[in-house]
Curated annotation (Swiss-Prot):
Oligomer status and interactors: Heterodimer of an alpha and a beta chain.
Name recorded for this polypeptide: Pyruvate dehydrogenase E1 component subunit beta
Oxidoreductase keyword on record: yes
Keywords assigned by UniProt, alphabetized: Lipoyl, Oxidoreductase, Pyruvate, Thiamine pyrophosphate
EC number: 1.2.4.1
GO MF annotations, alphabetized: pyruvate dehydrogenase (acetyl-transferring) activity
Catalytic activity: N(6)-[(R)-lipoyl]-L-lysyl-[protein] + pyruvate + H(+) = N(6)-[(R)-S(8)-acetyldihydrolipoyl]-L-lysyl-[protein] + CO2
Taxonomic path: Bacteria, Pseudomonadati, Pseudomonadota, Alphaproteobacteria, Hyphomicrobiales
UniProt cross-references to Pfam families, sorted A to Z: Biotin_lipoyl, Transket_pyr, Transketolase_C
Entry-linked PANTHER family: DEHYDROGENASE RELATED, PYRUVATE DEHYDROGENASE E1 COMPONENT SUBUNIT BETA, MITOCHONDRIAL
Length: 460
Protein backbone atom coordinates (compact mmCIF):
# COMPACT_ATOMS: atom_id res chain seq x y z
CA UNK A 1 0.00 0.00 0.00
CA UNK A 2 1.39 3.46 -0.83
CA UNK A 3 2.69 5.32 2.21
CA UNK A 4 1.77 8.91 2.96
CA UNK A 5 4.59 11.23 4.01
CA UNK A 6 3.19 13.72 6.51
CA UNK A 7 4.14 17.29 7.38
CA UNK A 8 6.32 16.93 10.50
CA UNK A 9 6.50 19.27 13.47
CA UNK A 10 9.65 21.22 14.28
CA UNK A 11 8.55 21.39 17.90
CA UNK A 12 5.74 20.06 20.11
CA UNK A 13 3.90 23.37 19.80
CA UNK A 14 4.22 23.76 16.04
CA UNK A 15 0.87 23.67 14.24
CA UNK A 16 1.84 24.67 10.69
CA UNK A 17 4.83 25.62 8.58
CA UNK A 18 6.10 26.37 5.10
CA UNK A 19 7.14 23.65 2.68
CA UNK A 20 10.04 25.68 1.33
CA UNK A 21 11.35 23.31 -1.34
CA UNK A 22 11.39 19.79 -2.68
CA UNK A 23 14.74 18.05 -3.08
CA UNK A 24 13.24 15.06 -4.90
CA UNK A 25 10.86 14.88 -7.85
CA UNK A 26 8.03 12.53 -8.73
CA UNK A 27 9.48 9.28 -10.01
CA UNK A 28 12.72 9.57 -8.02
CA UNK A 29 13.82 6.51 -6.07
CA UNK A 30 14.66 7.11 -2.41
CA UNK A 31 16.01 5.11 0.52
CA UNK A 32 15.03 5.40 4.17
CA UNK A 33 16.69 8.52 5.57
CA UNK A 34 17.11 10.32 2.23
CA UNK A 35 16.32 14.03 2.49
CA UNK A 36 13.36 14.78 0.24
CA UNK A 37 12.26 18.29 1.27
CA UNK A 38 12.86 21.27 3.53
CA UNK A 39 10.26 22.89 5.79
CA UNK A 40 10.56 26.03 7.84
CA UNK A 41 8.88 28.31 10.34
CA UNK A 42 9.85 31.79 11.42
CA UNK A 43 12.28 30.20 13.90
CA UNK A 44 13.89 27.19 12.25
CA UNK A 45 14.41 25.08 9.14
CA UNK A 46 14.29 21.28 9.06
CA UNK A 47 14.88 18.55 6.51
CA UNK A 48 12.18 15.97 5.79
CA UNK A 49 13.46 12.42 5.35
CA UNK A 50 11.90 9.45 3.56
CA UNK A 51 10.41 7.00 6.05
CA UNK A 52 11.19 4.00 3.84
CA UNK A 53 12.70 3.05 0.50
CA UNK A 54 10.57 3.37 -2.60
CA UNK A 55 9.64 5.79 -5.36
CA UNK A 56 8.13 9.26 -4.97
CA UNK A 57 4.72 8.64 -6.50
CA UNK A 58 3.16 12.06 -6.06
CA UNK A 59 4.01 15.42 -4.51
CA UNK A 60 0.79 16.61 -2.88
CA UNK A 61 1.92 20.06 -1.72
CA UNK A 62 3.73 22.52 -4.01
CA UNK A 63 7.08 23.99 -3.01
CA UNK A 64 6.71 27.38 -1.34
CA UNK A 65 3.28 26.62 0.12
CA UNK A 66 2.77 28.39 3.43
CA UNK A 67 0.52 27.39 6.32
CA UNK A 68 0.77 23.64 5.79
CA UNK A 69 -0.79 22.01 8.85
CA UNK A 70 1.23 19.45 10.82
CA UNK A 71 0.34 15.85 9.82
CA UNK A 72 -1.02 16.96 6.44
CA UNK A 73 0.02 14.45 3.72
CA UNK A 74 2.64 16.18 1.57
CA UNK A 75 3.74 13.29 -0.65
CA UNK A 76 3.05 9.65 -1.41
CA UNK A 77 5.77 7.00 -1.44
CA UNK A 78 5.28 3.94 -3.64
CA UNK A 79 6.70 0.57 -2.58
CA UNK A 80 8.25 -2.00 -4.92
CA UNK A 81 5.77 -3.17 -7.53
CA UNK A 82 3.34 -0.29 -6.97
CA UNK A 83 2.35 2.19 -9.64
CA UNK A 84 0.97 5.72 -9.62
CA UNK A 85 -2.50 4.26 -10.22
CA UNK A 86 -2.34 2.67 -6.76
CA UNK A 87 -2.49 6.14 -5.22
CA UNK A 88 -6.04 6.61 -6.45
CA UNK A 89 -7.11 3.38 -4.73
CA UNK A 90 -5.75 4.40 -1.32
CA UNK A 91 -9.04 5.87 -0.18
CA UNK A 92 -11.01 2.79 -1.18
CA UNK A 93 -8.56 0.55 0.67
CA UNK A 94 -8.67 2.59 3.88
CA UNK A 95 -10.52 1.03 6.82
CA UNK A 96 -14.26 1.46 6.51
CA UNK A 97 -15.16 3.20 9.70
CA UNK A 98 -16.69 6.41 10.85
CA UNK A 99 -14.35 9.25 11.70
CA UNK A 100 -13.86 9.05 15.47
CA UNK A 101 -15.34 11.74 17.61
CA UNK A 102 -12.86 13.77 19.65
CA UNK A 103 -11.91 11.88 22.79
CA UNK A 104 -9.37 12.12 25.53
CA UNK A 105 -6.23 10.16 24.71
CA UNK A 106 -6.58 7.64 27.50
CA UNK A 107 -6.39 3.89 27.83
CA UNK A 108 -9.63 1.90 28.08
CA UNK A 109 -11.13 1.57 31.51
CA UNK A 110 -9.63 -1.48 33.20
CA UNK A 111 -11.60 -4.21 34.87
CA UNK A 112 -11.41 -4.15 38.64
CA UNK A 113 -10.12 -7.69 39.25
CA UNK A 114 -6.53 -8.66 38.39
CA UNK A 115 -6.20 -11.05 35.46
CA UNK A 116 -5.63 -14.66 36.42
CA UNK A 117 -2.28 -16.06 35.33
CA UNK A 118 -2.55 -18.46 32.40
CA UNK A 119 0.37 -20.80 31.79
CA UNK A 120 -0.34 -21.40 28.11
CA UNK A 121 -1.55 -19.27 25.23
CA UNK A 122 -4.57 -20.37 23.21
CA UNK A 123 -2.65 -20.78 19.94
CA UNK A 124 -2.75 -23.82 17.65
CA UNK A 125 0.27 -25.89 16.67
CA UNK A 126 2.19 -24.66 13.62
CA UNK A 127 -0.50 -24.75 10.93
CA UNK A 128 0.24 -26.06 7.47
CA UNK A 129 -1.21 -23.71 4.89
CA UNK A 130 -3.94 -25.70 3.09
CA UNK A 131 -3.30 -26.50 -0.56
CA UNK A 132 -4.97 -24.02 -2.83
CA UNK A 133 -5.03 -21.23 -0.23
CA UNK A 134 -5.16 -17.83 -1.90
CA UNK A 135 -2.07 -15.76 -1.18
CA UNK A 136 -1.75 -11.98 -1.01
CA UNK A 137 1.46 -10.03 -1.53
CA UNK A 138 1.99 -7.53 1.25
CA UNK A 139 4.80 -5.76 3.05
CA UNK A 140 5.88 -6.57 6.58
CA UNK A 141 4.48 -3.17 7.60
CA UNK A 142 1.04 -4.05 6.23
CA UNK A 143 1.09 -7.51 7.80
CA UNK A 144 1.81 -6.05 11.24
CA UNK A 145 -0.95 -3.49 10.85
CA UNK A 146 -3.45 -6.14 9.76
CA UNK A 147 -2.52 -8.34 12.72
CA UNK A 148 -3.21 -5.53 15.18
CA UNK A 149 -6.43 -4.52 13.44
CA UNK A 150 -7.78 -8.09 13.42
CA UNK A 151 -7.04 -8.61 17.10
CA UNK A 152 -8.51 -5.23 18.02
CA UNK A 153 -11.71 -6.11 16.17
CA UNK A 154 -11.89 -9.48 17.92
CA UNK A 155 -11.13 -8.27 21.45
CA UNK A 156 -12.11 -4.87 22.83
CA UNK A 157 -9.47 -5.19 25.56
CA UNK A 158 -6.69 -4.85 22.96
CA UNK A 159 -5.34 -1.35 22.39
CA UNK A 160 -2.15 0.21 21.06
CA UNK A 161 -0.17 3.04 22.62
CA UNK A 162 3.15 4.72 21.95
CA UNK A 163 4.96 7.61 20.33
CA UNK A 164 3.27 8.90 17.15
CA UNK A 165 1.02 5.83 16.77
CA UNK A 166 -2.22 7.77 16.29
CA UNK A 167 -2.23 11.13 14.52
CA UNK A 168 1.05 10.46 12.67
CA UNK A 169 0.04 6.81 12.05
CA UNK A 170 3.31 5.45 13.37
CA UNK A 171 6.89 6.59 12.89
CA UNK A 172 7.18 3.87 10.23
CA UNK A 173 3.47 3.87 9.34
CA UNK A 174 2.84 0.48 10.93
CA UNK A 175 -0.31 1.78 12.65
CA UNK A 176 -1.63 3.45 9.49
CA UNK A 177 -5.43 3.57 9.52
CA UNK A 178 -5.92 2.29 13.07
CA UNK A 179 -6.92 5.65 14.56
CA UNK A 180 -9.57 6.09 11.87
CA UNK A 181 -11.10 2.69 12.64
CA UNK A 182 -10.74 2.40 16.41
CA UNK A 183 -10.58 5.98 17.66
CA UNK A 184 -8.34 7.79 20.12
CA UNK A 185 -9.45 5.69 23.08
CA UNK A 186 -7.79 2.56 21.66
CA UNK A 187 -4.99 4.13 19.59
CA UNK A 188 -3.21 6.34 22.10
CA UNK A 189 -0.47 8.86 21.38
CA UNK A 190 1.96 9.20 24.28
CA UNK A 191 4.61 11.71 25.30
CA UNK A 192 8.26 10.83 24.70
CA UNK A 193 8.48 9.22 28.13
CA UNK A 194 9.18 5.54 27.55
CA UNK A 195 9.49 4.65 31.23
CA UNK A 196 6.14 6.30 31.91
CA UNK A 197 3.97 4.87 29.15
CA UNK A 198 5.57 1.41 29.45
CA UNK A 199 4.52 1.47 33.10
CA UNK A 200 0.99 2.54 32.15
CA UNK A 201 0.88 -0.39 29.73
CA UNK A 202 2.07 -2.88 32.35
CA UNK A 203 -0.51 -1.59 34.82
CA UNK A 204 -3.25 -1.92 32.22
CA UNK A 205 -2.16 -5.50 31.53
CA UNK A 206 -2.21 -6.37 35.22
CA UNK A 207 -5.84 -5.27 35.41
CA UNK A 208 -7.03 -7.34 32.47
CA UNK A 209 -6.42 -5.30 29.32
CA UNK A 210 -4.10 -6.33 26.48
CA UNK A 211 -1.86 -3.41 25.56
CA UNK A 212 0.41 -3.24 22.52
CA UNK A 213 3.16 -0.78 23.44
CA UNK A 214 5.07 0.56 20.45
CA UNK A 215 8.53 2.01 20.87
CA UNK A 216 9.64 4.27 18.03
CA UNK A 217 12.84 2.22 18.24
CA UNK A 218 13.81 -0.43 20.77
CA UNK A 219 16.86 1.64 21.58
CA UNK A 220 14.44 3.98 23.37
CA UNK A 221 13.10 1.01 25.34
CA UNK A 222 16.27 1.14 27.43
CA UNK A 223 14.55 4.02 29.23
CA UNK A 224 11.76 1.58 30.11
CA UNK A 225 13.80 -1.54 30.83
CA UNK A 226 12.90 -1.44 34.54
CA UNK A 227 9.19 -1.61 33.70
CA UNK A 228 9.74 -4.37 31.13
CA UNK A 229 11.89 -6.61 33.32
CA UNK A 230 11.04 -5.82 36.94
CA UNK A 231 7.34 -5.12 36.45
CA UNK A 232 6.18 -7.12 33.41
CA UNK A 233 8.51 -10.13 33.28
CA UNK A 234 8.57 -10.94 37.01
CA UNK A 235 4.93 -10.37 37.96
CA UNK A 236 3.72 -13.92 37.33
CA UNK A 237 6.50 -15.47 39.44
CA UNK A 238 6.40 -12.90 42.25
CA UNK A 239 2.62 -13.18 42.58
CA UNK A 240 2.76 -16.95 42.85
CA UNK A 241 0.84 -17.29 39.61
CA UNK A 242 -2.01 -15.08 40.80
CA UNK A 243 -1.47 -12.23 38.35
CA UNK A 244 0.01 -11.96 34.87
CA UNK A 245 0.91 -9.21 32.43
CA UNK A 246 -0.41 -9.96 28.92
CA UNK A 247 1.40 -7.16 27.10
CA UNK A 248 3.30 -6.82 23.82
CA UNK A 249 6.27 -4.47 23.53
CA UNK A 250 6.98 -3.99 19.82
CA UNK A 251 9.08 -1.81 17.52
CA UNK A 252 12.17 -1.83 15.28
CA UNK A 253 15.44 -3.30 16.54
CA UNK A 254 18.88 -3.49 14.96
CA UNK A 255 20.72 -1.49 12.34
CA UNK A 256 18.83 0.58 9.78
CA UNK A 257 20.68 2.98 7.50
CA UNK A 258 23.20 5.33 9.08
CA UNK A 259 21.44 5.95 12.37
CA UNK A 260 24.67 5.43 14.33
CA UNK A 261 25.56 3.78 17.62
CA UNK A 262 22.62 4.82 19.81
CA UNK A 263 19.93 3.75 17.34
CA UNK A 264 21.33 0.55 15.81
CA UNK A 265 21.44 -2.07 18.57
CA UNK A 266 19.87 -5.49 18.16
CA UNK A 267 18.06 -6.47 21.36
CA UNK A 268 17.34 -10.12 20.59
CA UNK A 269 20.03 -11.45 22.92
CA UNK A 270 19.47 -8.72 25.54
CA UNK A 271 15.87 -9.65 26.31
CA UNK A 272 16.35 -13.38 25.74
CA UNK A 273 18.31 -13.48 29.03
CA UNK A 274 15.19 -12.67 31.06
CA UNK A 275 12.96 -15.38 32.58
CA UNK A 276 9.31 -14.42 32.15
CA UNK A 277 9.72 -12.79 28.73
CA UNK A 278 9.05 -14.26 25.32
CA UNK A 279 11.16 -12.81 22.49
CA UNK A 280 10.03 -12.91 18.86
CA UNK A 281 11.86 -11.60 15.77
CA UNK A 282 10.19 -12.54 12.44
CA UNK A 283 11.58 -12.25 8.93
CA UNK A 284 8.66 -12.68 6.52
CA UNK A 285 5.36 -10.80 6.40
CA UNK A 286 3.41 -14.02 7.03
CA UNK A 287 5.45 -14.77 10.15
CA UNK A 288 5.13 -11.16 11.30
CA UNK A 289 1.34 -11.34 11.06
CA UNK A 290 0.87 -14.81 12.52
CA UNK A 291 3.31 -14.29 15.38
CA UNK A 292 2.06 -10.82 16.33
CA UNK A 293 -1.48 -12.18 16.60
CA UNK A 294 -0.15 -14.95 18.83
CA UNK A 295 1.81 -12.44 20.92
CA UNK A 296 -1.29 -10.31 21.50
CA UNK A 297 -3.21 -13.37 22.70
CA UNK A 298 -0.38 -14.66 24.88
CA UNK A 299 -0.88 -14.35 28.66
CA UNK A 300 2.80 -13.47 29.09
CA UNK A 301 4.77 -10.31 28.22
CA UNK A 302 6.21 -10.59 24.71
CA UNK A 303 9.11 -8.63 23.21
CA UNK A 304 8.27 -8.35 19.50
CA UNK A 305 11.33 -7.16 17.58
CA UNK A 306 10.94 -5.82 14.05
CA UNK A 307 13.44 -4.32 11.61
CA UNK A 308 13.22 -0.96 9.90
CA UNK A 309 14.76 -2.24 6.66
CA UNK A 310 12.31 -5.16 6.46
CA UNK A 311 9.19 -2.99 6.88
CA UNK A 312 8.98 -2.30 3.14
CA UNK A 313 9.86 -5.81 1.97
CA UNK A 314 7.04 -7.79 0.34
CA UNK A 315 6.17 -11.46 0.94
CA UNK A 316 3.29 -13.84 0.30
CA UNK A 317 0.73 -14.01 3.13
CA UNK A 318 -2.11 -16.57 3.20
CA UNK A 319 -5.58 -15.08 2.98
CA UNK A 320 -7.09 -16.96 5.90
CA UNK A 321 -9.73 -15.81 8.37
CA UNK A 322 -7.47 -16.22 11.39
CA UNK A 323 -3.84 -16.95 10.53
CA UNK A 324 -1.96 -17.47 13.81
CA UNK A 325 1.48 -19.04 14.31
CA UNK A 326 2.80 -20.59 17.52
CA UNK A 327 5.49 -18.75 19.47
CA UNK A 328 8.53 -20.96 20.04
CA UNK A 329 8.48 -22.88 16.76
CA UNK A 330 11.24 -22.44 14.14
CA UNK A 331 10.63 -22.76 10.40
CA UNK A 332 12.79 -24.67 7.93
CA UNK A 333 13.14 -22.10 5.16
CA UNK A 334 15.20 -24.35 2.90
CA UNK A 335 16.15 -28.02 3.15
CA UNK A 336 19.72 -29.18 2.58
CA UNK A 337 22.18 -31.93 3.47
CA UNK A 338 25.68 -30.42 3.72
CA UNK A 339 25.43 -27.75 6.45
CA UNK A 340 22.87 -26.02 8.67
CA UNK A 341 22.48 -22.23 8.68
CA UNK A 342 20.46 -20.79 11.58
CA UNK A 343 19.32 -17.18 11.63
CA UNK A 344 16.36 -14.89 12.40
CA UNK A 345 15.00 -11.48 11.43
CA UNK A 346 17.10 -9.56 8.94
CA UNK A 347 19.91 -12.07 9.41
CA UNK A 348 17.89 -14.33 7.11
CA UNK A 349 18.77 -12.07 4.17
CA UNK A 350 22.44 -12.99 4.56
CA UNK A 351 21.65 -16.69 4.98
CA UNK A 352 19.40 -16.87 1.92
CA UNK A 353 21.86 -15.08 -0.38
CA UNK A 354 24.76 -17.15 0.93
CA UNK A 355 22.85 -20.39 0.33
CA UNK A 356 22.25 -19.41 -3.29
CA UNK A 357 25.97 -18.73 -3.81
CA UNK A 358 26.93 -21.96 -2.09
CA UNK A 359 24.50 -23.97 -4.20
CA UNK A 360 26.33 -22.75 -7.30
CA UNK A 361 29.50 -24.14 -5.73
CA UNK A 362 27.95 -27.53 -5.03
CA UNK A 363 27.20 -27.06 -1.30
CA UNK A 364 23.61 -27.82 -0.24
CA UNK A 365 22.66 -25.72 2.80
CA UNK A 366 19.65 -26.11 5.10
CA UNK A 367 18.32 -22.79 6.47
CA UNK A 368 16.40 -22.57 9.74
CA UNK A 369 14.57 -19.35 10.61
CA UNK A 370 14.29 -19.34 14.42
CA UNK A 371 11.45 -16.76 14.42
CA UNK A 372 11.38 -16.97 18.24
CA UNK A 373 14.49 -16.39 20.35
CA UNK A 374 12.86 -17.27 23.68
CA UNK A 375 11.58 -19.94 23.99
CA UNK A 376 14.06 -21.30 21.43
CA UNK A 377 13.15 -24.24 19.21
CA UNK A 378 16.40 -26.13 19.77
CA UNK A 379 14.97 -29.55 18.77
CA UNK A 380 14.50 -28.35 15.18
CA UNK A 381 18.10 -27.11 15.10
CA UNK A 382 19.46 -30.36 16.55
CA UNK A 383 17.50 -32.53 14.11
CA UNK A 384 19.04 -30.56 11.26
CA UNK A 385 22.54 -30.84 12.73
CA UNK A 386 22.09 -34.61 13.07
CA UNK A 387 21.50 -34.67 9.31
CA UNK A 388 24.19 -32.21 8.16
CA UNK A 389 26.84 -32.49 10.88
CA UNK A 390 27.74 -28.82 10.50
CA UNK A 391 26.32 -25.59 11.93
CA UNK A 392 26.77 -21.86 11.23
CA UNK A 393 24.68 -19.14 12.91
CA UNK A 394 24.04 -15.65 11.50
CA UNK A 395 22.86 -12.47 13.26
CA UNK A 396 23.52 -8.73 13.32
CA UNK A 397 23.88 -8.35 17.10
CA UNK A 398 27.10 -8.16 19.07
CA UNK A 399 29.22 -11.35 19.11
CA UNK A 400 29.67 -11.74 22.88
CA UNK A 401 26.79 -13.51 24.67
CA UNK A 402 24.92 -13.59 21.37
CA UNK A 403 22.03 -15.76 20.21
CA UNK A 404 24.53 -17.70 18.11
CA UNK A 405 26.78 -18.48 21.06
CA UNK A 406 23.76 -19.72 23.03
CA UNK A 407 22.83 -22.04 20.16
CA UNK A 408 26.43 -23.24 19.87
CA UNK A 409 26.62 -24.01 23.58
CA UNK A 410 23.40 -25.99 23.66
CA UNK A 411 24.15 -27.93 20.47
CA UNK A 412 27.58 -28.83 21.86
CA UNK A 413 25.91 -30.07 25.05
CA UNK A 414 23.13 -32.03 23.37
CA UNK A 415 24.43 -33.08 19.95
CA UNK A 416 28.24 -33.07 20.15
CA UNK A 417 28.60 -36.58 18.73
CA UNK A 418 26.81 -35.54 15.54
CA UNK A 419 29.17 -32.66 14.72
CA UNK A 420 31.75 -33.11 11.97
CA UNK A 421 33.24 -29.62 12.38
CA UNK A 422 33.40 -26.79 14.92
CA UNK A 423 30.33 -24.55 15.13
CA UNK A 424 30.95 -21.10 13.66
CA UNK A 425 29.00 -17.94 14.56
CA UNK A 426 28.65 -14.88 12.33
CA UNK A 427 27.62 -11.64 14.06
CA UNK A 428 28.12 -7.89 13.96
CA UNK A 429 31.52 -6.57 14.94
CA UNK A 430 32.25 -5.89 18.61
CA UNK A 431 32.09 -2.09 18.25
CA UNK A 432 29.44 0.62 18.61
CA UNK A 433 27.77 1.11 15.22
CA UNK A 434 29.60 3.79 13.18
CA UNK A 435 27.70 6.57 11.43
CA UNK A 436 29.86 6.68 8.28
CA UNK A 437 28.36 4.45 5.58
CA UNK A 438 31.63 2.70 4.73
CA UNK A 439 32.35 1.92 8.39
CA UNK A 440 28.76 0.84 9.07
CA UNK A 441 29.09 -1.68 6.23
CA UNK A 442 32.25 -3.07 7.82
CA UNK A 443 30.57 -3.37 11.23
CA UNK A 444 27.72 -5.53 9.92
CA UNK A 445 27.90 -9.15 8.74
CA UNK A 446 28.00 -9.78 5.01
CA UNK A 447 27.20 -12.60 2.63
CA UNK A 448 30.86 -13.32 1.91
CA UNK A 449 31.49 -14.00 5.61
CA UNK A 450 28.62 -16.48 5.70
CA UNK A 451 29.81 -18.22 2.53
CA UNK A 452 33.35 -18.49 3.88
CA UNK A 453 32.10 -19.88 7.22
CA UNK A 454 30.01 -22.59 5.56
CA UNK A 455 32.89 -23.55 3.28
CA UNK A 456 35.16 -23.71 6.33
CA UNK A 457 32.93 -26.15 8.22
CA UNK A 458 32.60 -28.19 5.02
CA UNK A 459 36.40 -28.15 4.63
CA UNK A 460 36.15 -26.61 1.17
Amino acid sequence: MPVEILMPALSPTMEEGTLSKWLKNEGDKVSSGDVIAEIETDKATMEVEAVDEGTIGKLLIAAGTEGVKVNTPIAVLLQDGEAASDIDSMKTEAPKAETPKPAAAEAPAASAAPVAAQPKADVPSDPAIPAGTEMATMTVREALRDAMAEEMRANEDVFVMGEEVAEYQGAYKVTQGLLQEFGARRVVDTPITEHGFAGVGVGAAMTGLRPIVEFMTFNFAMQAIDQIINSAAKTLYMSGGQMGAPIVFRGPSGAAARVAAQHSQCYAAWYSHIPGLKVVMPYTAADAKGLLKAAIRDPNPVIFLENEILYGQSFEVPKLDDFVLPIGKARIHRTGKDATLVSFGIGMTYAIKAAAELEAQGIDVEIIDLRTIRPMDLPTVIESVKKTGRLVTVEEGYPQSSVGTEIATRVMQQAFDYLDAPILTIAGKDVPMPYAANLEKLALPNVAEVVDAVKAVCYK
